[in-house]
């Protein structure tokens, strides 16, 4: 069994809908190829009754947060290799975020997986962090599709970031959160957006 003292890999992917069986199979194959300890998905577009359709060998433990319609939706998948003990799950009724608190070999871990709305993303995340602050601790990972760029290095166009995004950055700083990617790659201009399904080409903000 893997522990936090071992190498812990986490991947995140906006799947833009998983109701199509071919799409689910492609996502399943991608996850198996990446072989992460934890996988966070955004825009699953599941309703509660649809979640049974996501089955991936090796990742039997899946936590969903779904809205009432086929939009938004987030999920956290835990590898069978990980001895994970859940403690608390907080789900957004609109399917825009999920908080999972648990432990791996008695070491606490909190994951906040976010799919922010296309409009007003920075303000939404800022308000969300205040709303769920009591669940966050010094072993918290915040990830997902923020629908914004936190830095001008995170976007292909070099326009200045908005005042709402600057306010969000201030909140993250005040809460002592660190942008792991930007810390490890301070000057990188890589992007993680892909244009459609799982074969994508167009660069866009690193969300």
Residue positions per predicted region:
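Short phosphate/oxyanion-binding micro-motifs
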Residues: 1-142, 150, 155-177
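Flexible loop residues that form catalytic
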Residues: 44, 185, 206
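Short, conserved micro-motifs composed of acidic
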Residues: 55, 185-199
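His/Asp/Glu-enriched short active-site or ligand-binding loop at hydrolase and phosphoryl-transfer sites
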Residues: 177-185
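Conserved small/polar residues in nucleotide/adenosyl-binding loops
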Residues: 200-207
